[in-house]
Amino acid sequence: MDPVPSTQTQKWPGKHADLDPEPSLLRYCDGRVHVGSGKLAEKKTLLTGGDSGIGKAAAVMFAREGSDLVISCLPEERDDAEVTRDLIEREGRNCWIWEGKLDKSDNCRDLVDFALKKLGWIDVLVNNIAYQQVAQSIEDIDDEQWDLTFKTNIFSFFWVTKAAISHMKSGSSIVNCSSINAYVGRPDLLDYTSTKGAITAFTRGLSNQYAQHGIRVNAVAPGPIYTPLVSSTFPKEKIELSDQVPLGRMGQPVEVASCYLFLACSDGGYMTGQTLHPNGGTVINN
């Protein structure tokens, strides 16, 4: 897999369609394309942030494995989300788009109600959305940014999960997107890093609450991945992060989506309260 060009920047929240080369959704680093084997046959998935990046790759991969989906997107990301829907429908599965922000509890409940109406039930919940902006010092983070980052990155996980979990049966799975930054403490993403630490703790606590009900709760903590989130956050000289990665390159969305899939399906049936670390070789001490 070739190194990712380091010259691209976008305005927030970034567009999947504008990245060149296009991030890999289903093709692995050895050139092999993901082949479905029914791991999510007839399952119903609610996935937030399915318009681009990791969420897009996971949505298409889940469809290839047999799942119907509801995905969420921001209004300005609708075009990308419609491409995701088209890709899912090509896999012979159904996809519905819920458009809006998830920084308010009412919106999160509306999303879950929409998903239940379209899907009938929820087998897999993937909390995937995130917001981040660079700030070099705590003094540069105003209350508005702190509030938005927390409401998007962890409050939404709580609100969506709270609304959905009573509709999930034994054998269901929840996958939360954390980050390597929860473990290494990136200094220019203090608010974002703080929310990712909260997601790790949320995952562990919730897993202990619902293990007795047969509902598994896990997280994935990606390292630097080639997505619009990165290109719309950092200046171009900081986008190429491969010199920080033992494997010498940024990851591709497919390489995180496969972790989501493992945790969502019965392959990960003995996993709960855990975090997977697709980060290119950075050693993490949990």
From Swiss-Prot:
Keywords: NADP, Oxidoreductase. The keyword Metal-binding does not apply. One of its GO terms (biological process) is fatty acid metabolic process. Its EC number is 1.-.-.-. InterPro entries: NAD(P)-bd_dom_sf (IPR036291), Sc_DH/Rdtase_CS (IPR020904), SDR_fam (IPR002347). Gene3D superfamilies: NAD(P)-binding Rossmann-like Domain. Pfam families: adh_short_C2 (PF13561). NADP(+) binds at I54, N128, K162, Y192, K196, I225, T227. The keyword Oxidoreductase applies. The active site is at S178 (proton donor), Y192 (proton acceptor), K196 (lowers pka of active site tyr). SUPFAM superfamilies: NAD(P)-binding Rossmann-fold domains (SSF51735). GO terms for molecular function: 3-hydroxyacyl-CoA dehydrogenase activity. One of its GO terms (cellular component) is nucleus. PROSITE patterns: ADH_SHORT. It comes from the Eukaryota. Belongs to the short-chain dehydrogenases/reductases (SDR) family. This is Uncharacterized oxidoreductase C4H3.08. It comes from Schizosaccharomyces pombe (strain 972 / ATCC 24843) (Fission yeast).
